[in-house]
Amino acid sequence: MKWTNSKEQYKRFIMLLGTILIVAVHTAMFACLWYNYYANRNLTDMRKYFKYFYFYRRGHWTIIVLYALVLILFMKVLGGFRVGYLRNLDVLYSQILSVCATNAVEYLQLALIAKRWKFLWFSSPMLGLSVLQIVVGVIWIIAMRTIYARLYPPHEMLLIYGDISPKALIRKLQSRGDKYRVKETIHLKAGMDEILSRIAAYESVIIGDIPSHERNQFLKFCFQNNIRCYSVPKISDIMIISASEIDLFDSPLLLFRNQGMTFGQSFCKRAMDIAIGLVGCIAASPVMLLIAAAIKLYDGGPVLYSQERITKDGRPFQIYKFRSMIVESEKRGARLASEHDDRITPVGKVIRRLHVDELPQLFNVLIGDMSFVGPRPEREEITKEYERSIPQFRFRLKVKAGLTGYAQVYGQYNTVPYDKLKLDLTYIENYSLWLDMKLILLTVKILFQKEKSEGVDDSQKTALKDV
């Protein structure tokens, strides 16, 4: 046991060194640029902009350390350090966005220090730095992925399942064959003794959506025998995780407040929605004009598409989107867009792929029908259909609907509604202003991921499809 813990700590230390290395290299590259270009007061062409950069040694270090801290913040939020946990391409997206965001923040800071907005035109050195850092990031990802594969070979796992088919879960695990290998599956019908004996033969176990009584027995057995265990959470588990711990004499208690956001949280969230909505409308106006022109030129139909959706407490409202389907696409009734939906126009495919079809919802945010972050709004009839299979689906209506959300960032467009509900409840139960800001940053990242914009599986019929 002692050796196992020491070995695990050694692995984590190696990965930590890799994290420190990439931050140090990126910071050193910026320091070279700072000393040799921006802080060089002898550059005659730039003297009038750099005459304010008279720093002593501590001043230089302040700029460089601040750069490192901002870089760490973006890398941490966007997942730039998560080699092995995320796919290589996801880590690369995160690194690119982190580097570009950090350099943009630093460049704005330099412009403020210089007290000259014309300074913003001298961007080529920082752009060059960004390109070099991206190249270094690619090399780092390849090297760290190789090291990770040696330190953490794929787990051979036992999967325990019940009435719900394990095929979808196995399919997801197989997509990360570098981390997980389901070597054996066993049904609850095999009996408790047989399953416990099989668990003892593995280093890792994954427990599917099975009754709580049996699941708890497996969890206790794994805990007692130091066996790594993964468990598909139930809706009640998500509530338990977010509960507050209180001590009443010698008896620990969990407190479930179940009251939604506090007044302070609601006020801050609304203020942030208004600020981001105003900035977003102004910044996105050229793009929205181009999209409107493209839609109009394609078939001459209406540019916008409005539809009734429901938000907090089931209140109906009109949501606005750029029209991505043919005119009268729902004359045969409401249905979700499928992966190969023939109703989607060529222009619609492009704007859906880029997630810009939802830009008009910035006005819904300003009006107050929606928030910038929250569960995506559904139609009343779709919600009722899901509630037949999942009575708890209405739990999503405890907060305002959102333009982006936890389920959009961590799920996929074709994630089954039951799993989307779990993701949305994770957001609702763990809400904070910091979580909102994190999800907004991560939304920028998913704009470039195809699986986030595909339709539902053509064969999906129910909210619990798992075959």
Residue ranges and their predicted role:
Residues 4-5, 394-467:
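C-terminal terminal-structure detector
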Residues 1-29, 142-285, 454-455, 459-467:
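N-terminal hydrophobic signal-anchor/signal peptide
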Residues 95, 99, 154-169, 302-325:
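Membrane-cytosol interface motif
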Residues 1-149:
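Signature of alpha-helical transmembrane segments in polytopic membrane proteins
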Residues 236-237, 305-343, 404-422:
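Short, glycine-rich, amphipathic interfacial segments at transmembrane boundaries or analogous
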Residues 95-99, 103, 271-279, 354:
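Loop-to-transmembrane-helix entry motif
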Residues 265-328, 364, 439-467:
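A hydrophobic, helix-centered structural microdomain
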Residues 339-400, 439-443:
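A short, structured surface patch at a secondary-structure boundary
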